[in-house]
């Protein structure tokens, strides 16, 4: 179980590096993450097989010779991601490609979080429309939700804005959406977004 968790974390980190630094070689990924070249190669091969990552141009060989590195990049067309965010005064849902480019969206301004059941009902209906507009559920690789509050291991521990306490919102949404769902606090995901765009890559935590 522990090895599976380590591999999953490495997979996530490798995807993040490729997204932020593409085009990037396997060696560069290994050096940036301090993960063994063998582990990087194994995970990258799986990502290529799944269609999430593709190989592109060749780099220059080192001065000592040897094989030229092959650069990696995210395949934007490999799938879609459903994203949603709740903030203090508004909320939005959108469909993005794997590089975060927004394709379709809905926004909700000036609403009260006191009406969460009604809001979730509205979001559910609009989400179904967006999924259909994007070509169907089979095109999606997953969904991500950003919320204010305390989130741990994909579980909402406390969100006063949403009126949630120790809530397994992930399970509820996965059943509703029929796709993997990732939930985290808004502050963390904002920082992660900057990381992916390269603005904060040299900073950790």
What do the PLM-derived regions correspond to, one by one?
Residues 1-26, 31:
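Extreme N-terminal segment that seeds HTH/winged-HTH DNA-binding domains in transcriptional regulators
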Residues 25, 54-55:
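Short beta-strand(s) of the beta-wing in winged-helix/HTH DNA-binding folds
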Residues 29, 40-53:
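Basic amphipathic alpha-helical segments that dock to polyanions
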Residues 55-79, 185-205:
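Conserved phosphate-binding catalytic cores of ATP/NTP-utilizing and phosphoryl-transfer enzymes
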Residues 35-46, 63-65:
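Canonical helix-turn-helix DNA-binding module
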Residues 66-105:
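Gly/Thr-rich phosphate-binding beta-strand-loop-beta motif of the actin/hexokinase/Hsp70
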Residues 29, 105, 112-205:
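Glycine-rich phosphate-binding loop and adjoining helix at the ATP-binding site
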């Amino acid at each position: 179980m522990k090895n599976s968790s380590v591999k999953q974390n490495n997979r996530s980190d490798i995807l993040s590096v490729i997204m932020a630094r593409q085009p990037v070689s396997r060696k560069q990924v290994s050096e940036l993450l301090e993960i063994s070249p063998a582990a990087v190669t194994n995970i990258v091969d799986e990502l290529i097989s799944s269609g999430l990552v593709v190989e592109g141009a060749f780099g220059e060989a080192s001065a000592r010779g040897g094989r030229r590195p092959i650069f990696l990049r995210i395949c934007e067309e490999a799938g879609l991601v459903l994203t949603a965010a709740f903030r203090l005064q508004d909320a939005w849902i959108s469909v993005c490609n794997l590089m975060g480019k927004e394709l379709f969206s809905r926004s909700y301004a000036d609403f009260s979080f006191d009406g969460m059941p009604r809001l979730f009902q509205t979001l559910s209906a609009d989400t179904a429309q967006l999924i259909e507009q994007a070509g169907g559920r089979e095109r999606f690789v997953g969904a991500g939700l950003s919320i204010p509050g305390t989130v741990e291991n994909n579980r909402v521990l406390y969100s006063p804005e949403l009126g949630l306490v120790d809530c397994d919102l992930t399970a509820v949404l996965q059943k509703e959406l029929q796709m993997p769902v990732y939930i985290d606090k808004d502050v963390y995901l904002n920082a992660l977004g900057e990381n992916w765009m390269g603005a904060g890559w040299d900073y950790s935590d």
